[in-house]
């Protein structure tokens, strides 16, 4: 009996973790002129209020987490500098 209760509790814990996953929102812009690329962040710790640093066509920006996948979080190990990006 105890093993069944444990299994149910474990399953509920796993389900809670999966359902509480947060993502970067889908970017509004799908393209960007190279002269307008600006990084406001390079990692999540650059953002306030537990926002995510999300990669977009015009640079990296902080966004509130979304329940729906569609955006892409910035790789914290990638080479990045905040400010305007010049090619």
Curated annotation (Swiss-Prot):
It is found in: Secreted. Residues 1-20 form the signal peptide. Residues 21-66 form the WAP domain. It comes from the Eukaryota. SUPFAM superfamilies: Elafin-like (SSF57256). Keywords: Antibiotic, Antimicrobial, Disulfide bond, Secreted, Signal, Toxin. InterPro entries: Elafin-like_sf. The keyword Disulfide bond applies. Contains 5 disulfide bonds. GO terms for biological process: defense response to bacterium. GO terms for molecular function: toxin activity. Expressed by the venom gland. Disulfide bonds join 24-54, 32-58, 41-53, 42-80, 47-62. GO terms for cellular component: extracellular region. Belongs to the venom protein 11 family. 01 (wap-1) subfamily. Has antibacterial activity. This is U14-lycotoxin-Ls1a. The lineage of its organism: Eukaryota, Metazoa, Ecdysozoa, Arthropoda, Chelicerata.
């Amino acid at each position: 009996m105890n093993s069944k209760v444990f299994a149910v509790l474990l399953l509920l814990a796993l389900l809670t973790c999966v359902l509480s996953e947060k993502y970067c929102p889908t970017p509004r812009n799908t393209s960007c002129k190279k002269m307008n690329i600006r990084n406001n962040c390079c990692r999540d710790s650059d953002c306030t209020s537990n926002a995510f640093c999300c990669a977009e066509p015009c640079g990296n920006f902080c966004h509130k987490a979304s329940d729906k996948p569609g955006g892409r979080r910035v790789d914290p190990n990638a080479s990045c500098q905040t400010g305007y990006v010049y090619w």
